[in-house]
C-alpha cells in the first residue's frame, strides 16, 4: 500500500531531528537568479552552527554588477556596427539636406 510506504518514510525520523541544510545549499538555486539576495545573506559555519558575519563588500559589488562599463564600451568599439549605422544614417541625412538646399536655391533664383 502506497500510504504505508509514505508513512514509513516519515516515521523513521522526526521532522525536527533531521538536519536542515545550511543557507548556502538553500540559496544555491537562487544565487544565480538573484545574486543580490545571496549577497545579503549572513555567513554560516555548519560545523559549529555559528554566525560568522556578512560577506565582504567586494562580494556585494560583484553581485550587483554584471559587466563593467569598460568591457561594454570596448565591445561596442570592436564590433563597430552601431558606429557604421550611425555614420551611414548621417551621410543619408546630409545628402537629403544638401538636395533640399540646392533645390530651394534653384527655385529662389528662378523666382
From Swiss-Prot:
Domain of life where this protein originates: Eukaryota
Transmembrane segments: none
Single Gene Ontology BP annotation: terpenoid biosynthetic process
Pathway: Secondary metabolite biosynthesis; terpenoid biosynthesis; Mycotoxin biosynthesis
Region (Disordered) location: 1-24
Function: Part of the gene cluster that mediates the biosynthesis of the neurotoxin verrucosidin, a methylated alpha-pyrone polyketide that inhibits oxidative phosphorylation in mitochondria and thereby causes neurological diseases. The carbon backbone of verrucosidin is synthesized by the HR-PKS verA, and further modified by the other verrucodidin cluster enzymes.
Protein name stated in the entry: Verrucosidin biosynthesis cluster protein U2
Amino acid at each position: 500500500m502506497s500510504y504505508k510506504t509514505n508513512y514509513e518514510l516519515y516515521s523513521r525520523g522526526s521532522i525536527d531531528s533531521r538536519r536542515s541544510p545550511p543557507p548556502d545549499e538553500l540559496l544555491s538555486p537562487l544565487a544565480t537568479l538573484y545574486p543580490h539576495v545571496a549577497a545579503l545573506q549572513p555567513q554560516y559555519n555548519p560545523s559549529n552552527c555559528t554566525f560568522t558575519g556578512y560577506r565582504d563588500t567586494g562580494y556585494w559589488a560583484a553581485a550587483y554588477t554584471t559587466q563593467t562599463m569598460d568591457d561594454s564600451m570596448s565591445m561596442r568599439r570592436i564590433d563597430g556596427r552601431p558606429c557604421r549605422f550611425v555614420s551611414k544614417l548621417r551621410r543619408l541625412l546630409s545628402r537629403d539636406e544638401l538636395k533640399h538646399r540646392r533645390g530651394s536655391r534653384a527655385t529662389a533664383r528662378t523666382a
